[in-house]
Structure formats: structure tokens, C-alpha cells
Regions:
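Short internal beta-strands
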Residues: 37-41
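N-proximal low-complexity "stem/linker" segments adjacent to membrane-targeting elements
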Residues: 1-29
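Conserved catalytic core of nucleotide-sugar-dependent glycosyltransferases
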Residues: 109-199, 203, 219
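Short, aromatic/basic amphipathic alpha-helical patches
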Residues: 23-29, 47-56, 165, 244
Length: 293
């Protein structure tokens, strides 16, 4: 698709944080000049505050109606999660006449670019987000990929020796979702919906990728009140991770992760994806046998 015919916008999903939509300012500071919409639900008691602060940029959806269409994976009567908002994005994009969009959480402090220099993994803040989003839209237009994402700030702990940095491109898909409106997909599970999406759909042949060199840096999950903070504090990471196990038991399991410091071990429960059981394994071209002439 020619860029002149492209209709792109950024969706920031938020709840109860009208005065703390950090992602909005981060996008503007880092060179994004396009349209931004704040996506909130009608059960948010700060809807009017959002509209005051972001006039003509707030889209309110009916959460109860959206909830009827989601697969949350349980019978808990609690809608304090982002799942319905995520699944509404494609519908909202279609209604707005968008061809592409990026879906973001509201707590991104900045977006960085990782690169190798003098034997170390370095980082600079992205200066032209318009160019980044345009390049990813080009990728979606020329491939059957469903979404391409930024890595998380903590993904490359370990620097050049981190396993994900060596991959360059990973099959996971979290945080910054660049999407094509006519290529929809769904999220599943009350929480950990992003992991459940890319593992379950990965088994069905959907293509989701993370470009590791681009990273979104978030505030600590439980340091920013509102959003999903209360849910995470109430249920912990064990329950969070187990939703993905329920949906994809053949390739996701519960494991502990973390490291040590000052002679102590700091570990927490997290999900672990067995990728060889999750997505099709593509053999490198270097192993191709050349036919004898």
C-alpha cells in the first residue's frame, strides 16, 4: 500500500489514569506526529477527565457489551482487565476507516533502539517514531504477518549474551502491537492475554513477531496505580501465568525465573514457552541440500 493511501493512528489503552497517560507524551517527544486516540471504557469514573485533557481524542466503548464477546477463560465476575479493550481495537479501527494502527498501554516512559558498540549493548532513544511506524506498516503490507511488536526493556538483560538479542527477531508479541485493520486477531484470557494470544494463535499458524532492537520501557507493573495494578496485586504472577497454560498446555508451563544478588536468590513464578511445540519450525536455508548436476 502506498504511504499516501495509508490511514494510521495510535491507540493508547487506559483506565483510571487520566492524569498519567505517560505514553501520549512519550510518543510526541519521540517524533510521532500522527493521530492518537485514548481508548477507555464506559465504566471508568474518569471518562470526563480524559475528555477534558484529550479533547476529541477519547473513544469510549461499552465494556459490558464487549465483555459478552470475549473468552476470559474463567467464570469470575470481574471486568477490571484490559482484555475487552484489546479486542475492541480492530472494531474501532475499522469504524474510523484506519488501514493500520498501533496498540499501546498507557505507561511507556520512552522507546529505545538497541545496538552493539565496542563490545557492549547500547541504547539510544528513538527520535523519529513516524519513520518506525511507517516501516512496520510497510512490512505488514508486504508479508502475511499479523502483528509486529517492540521488545520489552527487560528482554535484553544480559546484554549481547542474552538469548533474545542473539535471535534478533522473536516469535513473542507483547506491548507495542502494530496491526493491519483487515488482518484481525483476538486476545484470550483474563490476564496474560498477550502471551496467551501469541502461543495459542502461533499454534494455528498466525505470524506474530518482536523486533528485538526496538524496545518499549514501562514503569514497574505495580508502581503505577490504576490500570491492572489492583488485579496483579490481588492474584499474583502464578494465576496470571496459568491462564496461558490453560489455553496452550502442550507448549506453555509454569516455571520460576529470576537471579541472585548479595548472596540471595530472587525468583518469581512466570510462564515458560516451549517454542518447538508452539510454532512451526523453519529450517535455515544453509541446511538445504544442493541437487547434484
Amino acid at each position: 500500500m502506498q504511504e499516501s493511501k495509508r490511514n494510521f493512528a495510535a491507540f493508547i489503552l487506559s483506565h483510571g489514569r487520566a492524569d498519567r497517560v505517560y505514553t501520549y507524551n512519550s510518543l510526541r517527544r519521540q517524533g510521532y506526529t500522527g493521530k492518537i486516540y485514548i481508548i477507555v471504557d464506559d465504566q471508568d469514573d474518569q471518562v470526563d477527565l480524559y475528555k477534558q485533557k484529550y479533547p476529541k481524542q477519547v473513544i469510549v466503548f461499552n465494556k459490558a457489551k464487549a465483555w459478552e464477546k470475549v473468552d476470559c477463560g474463567d467464570t469470575i465476575d470481574d471486568m477490571r482487565v484490559v482484555l475487552p479493550a484489546r479486542n475492541m481495537c480492530f472494531k474501532i479501527a475499522k469504524k474510523l476507516g484506519l488501514t493500520h494502527f498501533v496498540e499501546l498501554d498507557d505507561d511507556y516512559a520512552y522507546f529505545g533502539y538497541r545496538y552493539e558498540q565496542n563490545g557492549a549493548l547500547c541504547e539510544s532513544r528513538i527520535a523519529d517514531m513516524d519513520r518506525i511506524f511507517s516501516a512496520f506498516c510497510d512490512l505488514l503490507d508486504t508479508t502475511p504477518i499479523h502483528t509486529v511488536c517492540f521488545a520489552q526493556g527487560g528482554d535484553t538483560i544480559g546484554g549481547l549474551q542474552s538469548s533474545i538479542w542473539k535471535q534478533k527477531v522473536a516469535r513473542k508479541a507483547m506491548n507495542v502491537f502494530i496491526c493491519k485493520t483487515d488482518r484481525p486477531f483476538e486476545f484470550f484470557g483474563r490476564i496474560n492475554e498477550d502471551t496467551t494470544m501469541y502461543t495459542r494463535l502461533g499454534q494455528e499458524g498466525y505470524l506474530t513477531f518482536t523486533f528485538v532492537a526496538l524496545q518499549a520501557h514501562q514503569l514497574a507493573t505495580q508502581s503505577n496505580p490504576g490500570g491492572l495494578t489492583d488485579v496483579y496485586c490481588e492474584h499474583g504472577t502464578y494465576l496470571k501465568s496459568f491462564y496461558s497454560v490453560m489455553y496452550s498446555p502442550s507448549c506453555v508451563k509454569i516455571a520460576s525465573m529470576g537471579g541472585g544478588g548479595n548472596g540471595k536468590m530472587y525468583r518469581r513464578i512466570h510462564h515458560f514457552v516451549e517454542w518447538k511445540y508452539c510454532t512451526p519450525c523453519i529450517i535455515s536455508e544453509k541446511y538445504r541440500k544442493v541437487d547434484a548436476e
